[in-house]
Swiss-Prot record:
Family classification: Belongs to the TrkH potassium transport family.
UniProt subcellular location: Membrane
Function statement: May function as a potassium transporter.
GO MF, any single term: high-affinity potassium ion transmembrane transporter activity
Induction and repression of expression: Up-regulated by phagocytic stimuli.
CC terms in the record's Gene Ontology section: plasma membrane
Gene Ontology BP terms: intracellular potassium ion homeostasis; potassium ion import across plasma membrane
Database matches in InterPro entries: Cat_transpt (IPR003445), TrkH_K-transport (IPR051143)
Any Pfam family: TrkH
Keywords: Coiled coil, Glycoprotein, Ion transport, Membrane, Potassium, Potassium transport, Transmembrane, Transmembrane helix, Transport
Coiled coil: 199-227
Region (Disordered): 106-145, 223-261
Protein name: Putative potassium transport protein DDB_G0292412
Length: 648
């Protein structure tokens, strides 16, 4: 719909251009493909600015912001509807294991297995029945309450003396605590009042032990108070009797009194030590209770760790985009203003240098490949600074965005006063954000990207030695254009050399690179997806992607060949030219060798652009895209489902 509206606006401004061409260019800009059927260098500034807006709306980086906003909205809505899904500093898998308080624990199957055995209606009925107890168990159940349990995974330590089996030694920043409680259907409140919770039982045992110790202490104090009086009476009687005895007996009596006094002092010291130990134990117990009550804040989403982490992304991503735009615009514009040869090129094409800098900064960062010159960037193929700067903008806005985002988070976490949200993003990347990968997948993405670039440069140097496109160039300029072509061929679509002068072997190399243009990113995206069937399975990802990516272009090329059968028979165009343009559209690259197309073929190309853009997006089963998509057997998911049914 956005592409259609943009096309209508382009038609209203450039009314001489056919609507099908406006529609083609509008969707080409929105999908950041960059293919054009007419020369846009002569369009008005208003139309070009509209193209910049469409390009920005289709930006790979900008499209991640609505996902972040969606997840934050979901968290707020859940907290506002009920206070059952909450815990300050909770990790994304807040309740990962469901333990029913009256039923034996059992493992739940995945959604795919359930869908194979039961239809959707039966699954819904089973979801409702799972809340009810078995009548044969003869156990009392309150219809107003829903008893649930689970493992609460917190980011701060609560009790280091947890029972064995509940501690997670592999996660240094997370601590697992089993919880069991009830949810009131009417008030939607959750309470940890179930006696089956191990933590509650441990606290009750500690309280009983403290009460017993206090009773023993009171008994000891009473005995100590009675002991001096007894000792005095005994001493008086003994002294009266010993007055009639000899001096030796008197000395023995004095020795007895001394030993009793020493024993008394020892008992007092022992009691003091016991009281100090009890005081320390009480203080530790109170501190543990404070820590236990602090993270279990079930009524505030502002303390939720995932919510805080998403908030940091809402600041970092716009700052990332704006910073790159400013640096790219100023650097390119300043270079053009300071270079006489660059100014002469702009003047010859009737383009302002600063406007050229702004337009190409947006086009390069968003990998659109749209240019203000009719021959793309061929006129500046000897400008080292411009080509290198544009190439940096290209990979910062597409393939290497996850790499630099992870580096930024790592650096910020080292110097910020609040590092917990950043650490949460680094430790749980794909469960929170689509374009943030774990460390292993991030390194693999960067290594594969480097291998692709080096391989393309080497193959171009091997296959394109005597091509006319590189005549009158020195070795440094040739190597520069090899490098720029390796960066631009797979994503952006800028061309610094005339493609029609390249050999068919090099063009065939370009076809292969455009076809696999987004594979490094797609593989990292699918392998790192949370609760995905292709998680950590590169081979399965490649099979699924290749089957789909071969079938879709083949069908579209077949239809285009049917629509352009007359041009093929007359030799105006060739099958290879159709293949090159189709793969360029499907890969959202934008390289073109300028072929003539009919109206129906242009519509097929629009469908190819949209299909190519869709394959770079996460699947619908990705947890970081669909936060409400929890397992059907999860308690939270059931409660939300039943709540929606009541509203209906």
């Amino acid at each position: 719909m956005v592409g259609f509206i943009g096309s209508v606006l382009i038609k209203l401004i450039e009314f001489e251009v056919p609507f099908i061409d406006c529609l083609y260019i509008g969707y080409s800009a929105l999908t950041t493909t960059g293919l054009v059927t007419v020369d846009i260098s002569g369009w008005s500034s208003g139309t070009l600015f509209l193209l910049v807006i469409l390009v920005q709306l289709g930006s790979t980086v900008l499209l991640t912001l609505p996902i972040v906003l969606l997840r934050r909205f979901f968290i707020r809505s859940v907290y506002s509807n009920s206070s059952i899904i909450s815990a300050a500093n909770a990790s994304p898998d807040l309740i990962s294991t469901i333990i029913h308080s009256h039923l034996p624990h059992h493992d739940f199957k995945d959604d795919d297995d359930e869908n194979d055995n039961n239809n959707n209606e039966e699954n819904d009925d089973n979801d409702d029945e799972s809340y009810q107890h078995n009548n044969n168990n003869n156990e009392e159940h309150d219809d107003n309450d829903i008893e649930i349990g689970g493992i609460l995974k917190l980011d701060s330590p609560i009790d280091h003396n947890l029972p064995n089996g509940f501690q997670d030694d592999n996660a240094p920043h997370h601590y697992n605590i089993p919880i069991v409680g009830k949810i009131d259907k009417k008030s939607r409140k959750f309470s940890l009042d179930s006696p089956s919770s191990p933590i509650i039982q441990q606290q009750q045992q500690q309280q009983q032990q403290q009460q017993q110790q206090q009773q023993q202490q009171q008994q000891q104090q009473q005995q100590q108070q009675q002991q001096p009086s007894t000792t005095t009476t005994t001493t008086t009687t003994t002294n009266s009797t010993l007055n009639k005895s000899t001096n030796n007996s008197t000395n023995n009596n004095n020795n007895t009194n001394d030993s009793q006094s020493i024993q008394k002092e020892v008992n007092i010291d022992i009691n003091r030590i016991d009281s100090l130990q009890e005081l320390q134990e009480q203080q530790e117990h109170q501190q543990q209770q404070r820590q236990l009550s602090k993270p279990l804040n079930l009524n505030s989403y502002e303390d939720n760790m995932e919510y805080r982490s998403l908030g940091k992304l809402l600041v970092i991503i716009p700052c990332y985009i704006i910073t790159i735009y400013i640096l790219g615009f100023i650097s390119i514009g300043a270079y053009i203003a300071g270079s006489e040869s660059a100014r002469s090129i702009m003047k010859a094409n009737g383009v302002n240098g600063w406007w050229w800098s702004l337009f190409h900064t947006f086009s390069a960062f968003n990998n659109a490949g749209l240019a203000l010159f009719s021959d793309s960037l061929i006129q500046i193929n000897e400008k080292y600074f411009l080509l290198i700067t544009l190439s940096i903008l290209i990979f910062l806005g597409n393939t290497l965005f996850p790499v630099f985002l992870r580096i930024i988070l790592l650096v910020v976490s080292k110097f910020t006063k609040d590092p917990e949200p950043y650490r949460n993003l680094l430790e749980n990347p794909r469960s929170i954000f689509t374009h943030l990968f774990p460390y292993k997948e991030t390194v693999q993405l960067f290594v594969i990207w480097c291998i692709f670039n080096v391989s393309q440069i080497a193959l171009m140097a091997l296959l394109d030695v005597n091509d006319k496109a590189f005549t009158n160039m020195n070795y440094g300029t040739i190597l520069l254009n090899y490098y720029f072509s390796s960066i631009s061929t797979r994503t952006c679509g800028f061309n610094s050399v005339d493609l029609n002068l390249l050999s068919e072997s090099v063009l065939l190399l370009f076809v292969g690179l455009m076809f696999v243009s987004s594979y490094p990113f797609i593989i990292s995206l699918r392998r790192s997806a949370v609760n995905n069937k292709y998680s950590n399975q590169s081979r399965e990802v490649m099979k699924e992607v290749l089957i789909r990516d071969i079938f879709v272009p083949y069908i579209c090329i077949l239809f285009i060949a049917i629509f352009e059968s007359q041009l093929l028979e007359s030799g105006v165009i060739t099958v290879f030219q159709i293949l090159f343009e189709a793969i360029s559209a499907f890969g959202n690259v934008g390289l073109s060798i300028s072929i003539t197309l009919s109206t129906y073929s242009k519509l097929v190309f629009i469908a190819l652009m949209l299909a190519g853009k869709h394959r770079q997006l996460p699947e619908s089963v990705d947890e970081s895209v669909n936060p409400a998509l929890l397992k059907k057997n999860a308690v939270i998911s059931k409660i939300i489902t039943r709540y929606k049914r009541r509203k209906l």
